[in-house]
């Protein structure tokens, strides 16, 4: 059973029942819907499709809304694409909307002139063209073109190592989040999170619109987010290492080191972490990945990522089904080489010694020493399963829960396989029901030895305090 979770973006290349079915059968744990593109009607149709197929296949697939976030873009150019020459002067006009040409353009963020100073770098279209700030004249930013390249209408603008005073949540984001609450999504991947207050602002909108149970995965995409990573992790349900904008905002050679650092910090506190962007980028165009891409996926898993993600590969690429099946094969092969004893020893060193952690660690240690077929967790809120997952056991973690929403909240937790059950009564009923459900689902067989972890009393969340070893009958 694959332990690494997978999140695939559903888009124009994959919005059919046949392809979504193939995605779920390949192991999709969450569908991602990118609100940087498309309108509510378009996304509503795709969300409805995923809900239909997951019900048909009886799989607890989560639905993730990815916000557009506070991005900066160029205005219109005439012609819509043109070349800037290295060494030429170029002016960014902040005070008004103008039609751009080879000497000037306007941008969507009108206060840029307040944030930058001479010597700063401005990057256009994922860094394809660099501008060096020479002077600020009124609301105009006077630049020199650092390299010859193409610019065009509505291209992304990045300003590395500059704290941009954009609001963390735009009006569009707020509208999209409210739409997500109505659609009963399970998680938000929040773009361009720079500080914990950004996460709390999103949480406030969700709470005010019936989305209290929606998880927030903060996307770390710039230096400010990296600098505030500990505080951001604390207020987030999980983290996404969003390597696209990160690779523009931060020197590219530092991205792998930051990825490892963020994964390690999330592992230490037991919060899920997703590694994303360009994992199989060449499969947008080709039916087979590059060797480097295969290594990238495997190494993210060896680093300790809970989940891996496809963006354009599954949303807009020419080979969406091949991309998802390739990702699954690479993940499964990598998992065969994981040193689970080493993972467990490392987690033990990070132990905070509260009751839930001690019982969960004991559960994983017992499962390893006894070579148990599975760890079965009975959980009302998902807390027990998440804490056990933190210790990366070799045995699969079967999370038995009476809540469909909780089952989907576990979509990004490494190694956790949720099963829906009836509500639990007594402690004995909780244990027997959980084991029976795991047997019924085919995760264990009669005669298997399993380790059961749960919280008693059953109706109190976050109280993992019981461990039992038993043989399946």
UniProtKB/Swiss-Prot annotation:
Positions bound to K(+): 34, 36, 66-67
UniProt subunit comment: Homotetramer.
Keyword Magnesium: yes
Entry's Gene Ontology molecular function annotations: ATP binding; kinase activity; magnesium ion binding; potassium ion binding; pyruvate kinase activity
Gene name of the encoded protein: pyk
Root EC class: transferase
Binding-site list for substrate: 32, 244-245, 277
Residues annotated to bind ATP: 34-37, 73, 155
Reactions the enzyme catalyzes: pyruvate + ATP = phosphoenolpyruvate + ADP + H(+)
Residue numbers marked as site, Transition state stabilizer: 219
Protein name, entry field: Pyruvate kinase
Cited InterPro entries: Pyr_Knase (IPR001697), Pyrv/PenolPyrv_kinase-like_dom (IPR015813), Pyrv_kinase-like_dom_sf (IPR040442), Pyrv_Knase-like_insert_dom_sf (IPR011037), Pyrv_Knase_brl (IPR015793), Pyrv_Knase_C (IPR015795), Pyrv_Knase_C_sf (IPR036918), Pyrv_Knase_insert_dom_sf (IPR015806)
Disulfide bonds: none
């Amino acid at each position: 059973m694959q332990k690494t979770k997978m999140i695939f973006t559903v888009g124009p290349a994959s919005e059919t029942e046949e392809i979504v079915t193939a995605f779920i059968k390949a192991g999709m744990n969450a569908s991602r819907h990118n609100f940087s593109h498309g309108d509510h009607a378009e996304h509503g149709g795709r969300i409805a499709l995923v809900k239909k197929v997951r019900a048909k296949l009886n799989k607890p697939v989560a639905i993730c809304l990815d916000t557009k976030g506070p991005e900066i873009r160029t205005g219109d150019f005439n012609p819509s694409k043109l070349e800037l020459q290295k060494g030429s002067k170029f002016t960014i006009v902040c005070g008004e909307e103008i039609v751009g040409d080879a000497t000037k353009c306007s941008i969507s963020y009108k206060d840029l002139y307040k944030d930058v100073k001479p010597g700063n770098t401005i990057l256009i279209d994922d860094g394809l063209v660099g501008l060096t700030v020479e002077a600020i004249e009124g609301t105009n930013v006077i630049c020199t073109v650092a390299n010859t390249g193409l610019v065009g209408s509505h291209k992304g603008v990045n300003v590395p190592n500059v704290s941009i005073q954009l609001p963390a949540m735009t009006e569009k984001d707020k509208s999209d989040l409210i739409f997500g609450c109505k659609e009963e999504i399970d998680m938000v991947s929040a773009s361009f999170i720079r500080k914990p207050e950004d996460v709390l602002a999103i949480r406030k909108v969700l709470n005010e619109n019936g989305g209290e149970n929606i998880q927030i995965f903060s996307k770390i995409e710039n230096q400010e987010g990296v600098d505030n990573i500990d505080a951001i992790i604390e207020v987030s349900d999980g983290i996404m290492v969003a390597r696209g904008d990160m690779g523009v905002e931060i020197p590219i050679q530092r991205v792998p080191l930051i990825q490892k650092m963020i994964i390690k910090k999330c592992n230490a506190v037991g919060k899920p972490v997703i590694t994303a962007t360009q994992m199989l980028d060449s499969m947008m165009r080709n039916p087979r990945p590059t060797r480097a891409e295969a290594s990238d996926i495997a190494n993210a898993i060896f680093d300790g990522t809970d989940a891996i993600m496809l963006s354009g590969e599954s949303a807009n690429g020419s080979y969406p089904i091949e991309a998802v099946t390739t990702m699954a094969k690479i993940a499964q092969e990598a998992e065969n080489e994981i040193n689970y004893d080493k993972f467990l020893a490392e987690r033990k060193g990070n132990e905070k010694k509260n009751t839930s952690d001690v019982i969960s660690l004991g559960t994983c240690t017992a499962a390893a020493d006894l070579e148990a077929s599975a760890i079965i967790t009975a959980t009302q809120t998902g807390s027990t399963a998440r804490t056990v997952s933190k210790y990366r056991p070799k045995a699969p973690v079967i999370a038995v829960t009476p809540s469909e929403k909780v089952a989907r909240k576990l979509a990004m937790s490494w190694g956790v396989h949720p099963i829906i059950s009836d509500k639990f009564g007594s402690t004995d009923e909780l244990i027997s029901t959980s084991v029976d459900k795991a047997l019924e689902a085919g995760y264990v067989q009669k005669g298997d030895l399993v380790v059961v972890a749960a919280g008693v009393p059953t109706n109190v969340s976050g109280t993992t305090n019981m461990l039992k070893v038993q043989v399946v009958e």
